């Protein structure tokens, strides 16, 4: 089976000379105390930006930054700081307009010379107008499309959503294609969905089954084993009749959890023991030495325990393809990051294994351990990655032009 994105136009198929190019990127960067704390998303877009500029395009960049709920959000969510950082990284002048529609925008675009870059204001500023951006308002999409000759979508992180600045523009513009980052992400994920080397193992963490039920169900069909850790493991354990103490669980997902264990008894590998604490805090871990599989009433599970680390190590040792999404404990607490760190090391040390990691907290954990280069691919899009694994396609790809 061939993924549908292979039929879509790619940035290398486009002649950019003297054309005004609308580029949708994902500059949704973390900002702390008025400073950008990670430039990874900016760096990820550079190959596409340079391709357009170096080939004589007049570049207009669109991106969102956070969510906009009221006018009070606007000053904190301006893309000005990102435009300034992009100028610093590229070593060239970047024009910025604190608007994204209207005469000032049109005038600035009309004055662009080939090789120049203009960054428009946060697309979600339009959400103050009846959620026009997030609800893919047709008039807004048509307007943004009217500003350029070509549309390139390189915002992988938003491809699972139909917004005015992705689906809207692509629907109404004459020429469109996907950028380098989008193709790189889709190529990496396609390897494990459509043609994984086996054994193919998945590790799924995070707090809630409800957030990941789609991907868990899909992976139980596609993978050879699915290893479950994180907070969601306690829902599975309670469903099987184990005592879980004060641990979080989803009451309305107990039946579902039990049915998955019954349907996939050999594929679904659940955490055995846990590192425990009397409250949700970064305390010295406790362990139930008498009965590691159960959690006393006054304690809650905060991380996978040593038995589970060894269990996971044993299952993963012959893996040829591994997907990991979600931390296996409360990794932001130093005392409960051990499980996530140990599993990261296990995967990093596997030979001839194609490994993909996604999810912000999981990625932060491997970066903290200096293991980023030991993974085959680090995905930039959490929700988009999950949606593509579940469906083999993404809504944002739909209106992108087909290859000739």
Curated annotation (Swiss-Prot):
Record-linked Pfam families: PGK
Recorded catalytic activity of this chain's protein: (2R)-3-phosphoglycerate + ATP = (2R)-3-phospho-glyceroyl phosphate + ADP
Binding positions (substrate): 26-28, 41, 64-67, 124, 161
Intrachain disulfide bonds: none
Single GO MF annotation: ATP binding
The protein's annotated pathway: Carbohydrate degradation; glycolysis; pyruvate from D-glyceraldehyde 3-phosphate: step 2/5
Binding site for ATP: 212, 301, 332, 359-362
UniProt record, GO biological process: gluconeogenesis; glycolytic process
Localization per Swiss-Prot or TrEMBL: Cytoplasm
Enzyme Commission number(s): 2.7.2.3
Cellular component GO terms held in the UniProt record: cytosol
Main location: cytoplasm
Keywords, in A-Z order: ATP-binding, Cytoplasm, Glycolysis, Kinase, Nucleotide-binding, Transferase
Family per record: Belongs to the phosphoglycerate kinase family.
Record-given protein name: Phosphoglycerate kinase
Species of origin: Mesomycoplasma hyopneumoniae (strain 232)
